[in-house]
Curated annotation (Swiss-Prot):
GO terms for biological process: photosynthesis. The chain crosses the membrane at residues 22-42, 57-77. GO terms for cellular component: chloroplast thylakoid membrane; photosystem I. It holds the Pfam family Ycf4. Seems to be required for the assembly of the photosystem I complex. InterPro entries: PSI_Ycf4_assembly. HAMAP family: Ycf4. This is Photosystem I assembly protein Ycf4. The lineage of its organism: Eukaryota, Viridiplantae, Streptophyta, Embryophyta, Tracheophyta. PANTHER family: PHOTOSYSTEM I ASSEMBLY PROTEIN YCF4 (PTHR33288:SF4), PTHR33288. It comes from Draba nemorosa.
Length: 184
């Protein structure tokens, strides 16, 4: 989502609060909870899940392994839920032609660098760079090349933009910033 005027362009960045992340966190939580229940029921010899008899799974080695997978899955699920709660990766890119300043803001993990705020002068922007890798794991990324700073990604790699959409966005941004486009 973005907002534009004649001299200001604001690009809002979706962080980790995406539907796919909610689905993965929920599925992982339920699956790991199931593994932990099966491991616990095999240890105690009681039937917590009525799909099968607890005597069918011996605690050593199957019950131990299932308990381990359940605990590991719960930790990963907890990590996913925390990133969703903190909305890691969200923020905005603000391009202001009047002031000649570019501001990039992202939310990070809690701590000292929770708020990631970058500021550049527009005259330091060398180019807008598109990196396209086709194949099994296709990757399309839009970078802003800054003099003395290197390349800063503007679009996340997990967003599934087509090559045409990336090119369109790069052309609009390069025209707005009055810088050239590089393709790699």
């Amino acid at each position: 989502m973005s907002w534009r005027s004649e001299s200001i362009w604001i690009e809002f960045i979706t962080g980790s609060r995406k539907t796919s992340n909610f689905c993965w966190a929920f599925i992982l939580f339920l699956g790991s909870l199931g593994f932990l229940l099966v491991g616990t029921s095999s240890y105690l010899g009681r039937n917590f899940i009525s799909l099968f008899a607890s005597q069918q799974i011996i605690f050593f080695p199957q019950g131990i392994v299932m308990s381990f997978y359940g605990i590991a899955g719960l930790f990963i699920s907890c990590y996913l839920w925390c990133t969703i709660l903190w909305n890691v990766g969200s923020g905005y890119d603000l391009f202001d032609r009047k002031e000649g300043i570019v501001r990039i803001f992202r939310w990070g993990f809690p701590g000292k660098s929770r708020r990631i705020f970058l500021r550049f002068l527009m005259k330091d922007i060398q180019s807008i760079r598109i990196e396209v890798k086709e194949g099994v794991s296709a990757r399309r990324v839009l970078y802003m090349e800054i003099r003395g700073q290197g390349a800063i990604p503007l679009i996340r790699t997990d967003e599934n933009f087509t090559t045409r959409e990336i090119e369109q966005k790069a052309a609009e941004l390069a025209y707005f910033l009055r810088v050239p486009i590089e393709v790699f």
